[in-house]
Swiss-Prot record:
Protein name according to UniProt: High mobility group nucleosome-binding domain-containing protein 3
Subcellular location: Nucleus
Organismal lineage: Eukaryota, Metazoa, Chordata, Craniata, Vertebrata
GO MF annotation, one: nucleosomal DNA binding
Function: Binds to nucleosomes, regulating chromatin structure and consequently, chromatin-dependent processes such as transcription, DNA replication and DNA repair. Affects both insulin and glucagon levels and modulates the expression of pancreatic genes involved in insulin secretion. Regulates the expression of the glucose transporter SLC2A2 by binding specifically to its promoter region and recruiting PDX1 and additional transcription factors.
Tissues and organs where the protein is expressed, per its UniProt entry: Expressed at similar levels in mature oocytes and 2-4 cell embryos, but at higher levels in 8-16 cell embryos, morulae and blastocysts.
Protein family per UniProt: Belongs to the HMGN family.
Residue ranges of the region described as Disordered: 1-100
């Protein structure tokens, strides 16, 4: 394996191939304008936490539609956790407050 030639020994015919000098000149496009300053990021607004919408179980589509219709009409559909009772109580209280 041949030995490397040192950069000091560039007098030979292969001297220019051995040493690769870095260019000292920059392109006109890069040197013409400085790098633009980075704009500061705008502070994000922190909104109040919104309560998630009521979750509907993913069941049969027909049942889902029936439950929504029953809720819209105001019929007293039986509820597992008693939500309909509390909703009716709130409605009666709001009606009583309006009358006063």
């Amino acid at each position: 394996m041949p030995k490397r030639k040192s950069p000091e020994n560039t007098e030979g015919k292969d001297g220019s191939k051995v040493t690769k000098q870095e260019p000292t000149r920059r392109s006109a496009r890069l040197s013409a304008k400085p790098a633009p300053p980075k704009p500061e990021p705008k502070p994000r607004k922190t909104s109040a936490k919104k309560e998630p919408a009521a979750k509907v179980s993913k069941g049969v589509k027909g049942k889902k539609e029936e439950k929504q219709e029953a809720g819209k009409e105001g019929t007293a559909a039986p509820s597992e956790n008693g939500d309909t009772k509390t909703e009716e109580a709130q409605k009666t209280e709001s009606v009583a407050n309006e009358g006063e």
